Every structure is written in C-alpha cells, then in structure tokens.
C-alpha cells in the first residue's frame, strides 16, 4: 500500500489514518482537530487580508475600511478573521479544560508545548487586535506594552525598544504586523511537535486508564466523528459571522486611533478579560504583571500538583465540584474584566482572583488526597 510505504504518506498515515486511538474518547476530544481547523482558517483569511492591508499609521484604518467596502467579499474575509479569533479561543479554552478534567496534563511534554502554544496564540491575537488602528487598538497596545515597564531596571528601556520610539507609533504598528504574520507559522510548527509528543504516548481517554488492548484505527471512526464537530462548529461560526459580526468587537475600534483622546474604558477582547481582571485586582504594577503571567504559567504546575491515584476526574466527585467552581470563577473573572474599576467590582475581582489560585494550588491537590483516603488506597 502506497500510504504505508511512501515516505511522506507514511507520516500522514501514522498521524491521521492508522493511528491507534482509544475506542471511548468523547466529544471533548474533538477540539484538538477543531483547533487545527481554526488555525488553517486564520492563516487563510489572514493571508488574503494581508494582500490589501497597509501597516502604516496614516492608512491602516482606511485600508481596513477599503477591505470591507471595495474588495470582493472583503467584509466576509475580515469578519471571518476577526470572529475566527474568538472561535479559536473558545476551542482553546475547552481543549485546556478537557486536559485538566481528564488528567491529560500528565503527558508533560505535550502539555508544556500546549502552554507555549497558548502563550504564542495570545501574543498573536493581541498584535492582530492592534492592526486595524482604531481607538481600542491603539490604547490597548499602549496599556499592555506599558506593563513591561514594571520589570525592574530594564523595564522602561524594554518598552521603548518594543515601541521603536517614545510611544506607540508607526514603528510599533509595522513590527506588530510583521510579527502577527510570522507567528501563526511558528505556531503551526509547534502544533506538529505537540502532535509528535502526543503520538509517542497515545491519547488519554475519559476513564484515565490505559486503553492499549482495545484501540481502533483513527480512520474511519474519528475522521467521521471529527467531521461532525467541524460541521457543527462551522454552523455556529458562520451564523455569528453573517448575522452578528460585531457582537464580540468593541465599538471604539470603529473610531480611528487618536493619541490625544483616551476611551472611557480600555478593555481587551473578551477572551483576555479573565487575565485582565486578575491583572487589575492587584493595586501594584509589578504585582499585577506577575499575577497575570502566573495565571497562565500555573498550568505548568498541574502535573506536579496531581496527588490522586486516579488520573481522570470521572470518578472523583470532590475534585469535580472544584473543577466546575474553577470554571464558574473564570466566567466571573471574564465578566469583572469588562466592568469599570469601581465598587463592588473591585472586591469581586480580588476575591475571584484569590479563588482562582486557591482552587488550583491548594484545594484540588488536597481534594485528591482526601479522595485517596476515602477509597482507602
């Protein structure tokens, strides 16, 4: 068979066709392939947008308007790209949540590359948000890059180096466009490494136990199952793009960037609001930045905080309760991130931030130990 002998086809065959897969993985395992779909979608639409976009402060805003008004189906490509980012992060957060729930983080290499992918995706999305050069683009870039000035000693110099001047200006926009274009390809390369390490161990499953004795080939079982997920997610996506394209955006970004006029509420896109809320909950600049970075980096500690003798949460009611508390807490933080900095939102944000770290670092490891005791293992 050619797919088993041809050097290139052999790699594809081992990854997507004859790959031994657990027979019982649920719909939560669909999000890996959906993330691949999102990445392809973003690179394709982004490429066509880059053909018409100009990364100059004087013309960037107008070039985006030109894409929407004058380019054939430019409005569709632009809104697919903008909402594609939201879809990407929805799939990303569900994918990470699945990994936490079923103990997939015990595949350390795969998990750590996943965290690196999350950081790179967040950086790419942030820089992409700056490109239309609207009010929120400009002020978002100013606020977020300014956070680096909290780094002791080198901070202020580092910020000016990133800006390419003394404020967010033409140099900043040009380099953000260059980086926004190149990063997705670096992400694609890392995705292949992510898959390489995953296929070394094989997939986890909802029971969290080895499934070597009953594995099935990926094709046709999971190609079909993934395709169903693709159809469902595309229906949701296209409904949003065609009926509610601006629902997730900020109206301020329809005003061209003006360094002399600050918007009343500077807020990032919805998918960063939870981290923004954690950042704002600490009334000290360096402390806030450390909390912000820790909120993502804490994921890297999960393999070392795993105390239970079972891998998955499927049969651990205490840890399940804590997991869903964590999900609720993140939704609460997302809401707080979009609210102004005034009572009662300040204290709610601070309590939710404390709760976030407490659940992950303290309560879940303790719950694992209690469950071990309950089972008398």
Swiss-Prot record:
One of its GO terms (molecular function) is ubiquinol-cytochrome-c reductase activity. Gene3D superfamilies: Cytochrome Bc1 Complex, Chain C (1.20.810.10). SUPFAM superfamilies: a domain/subunit of cytochrome bc1 complex (Ubiquinol-cytochrome c reductase), Transmembrane di-heme cytochromes. Heme b b566 binds at residues 95, 194. Its cofactor is heme b. It is a multi-pass membrane protein. This is Cytochrome b. The gene is MT-CYB.
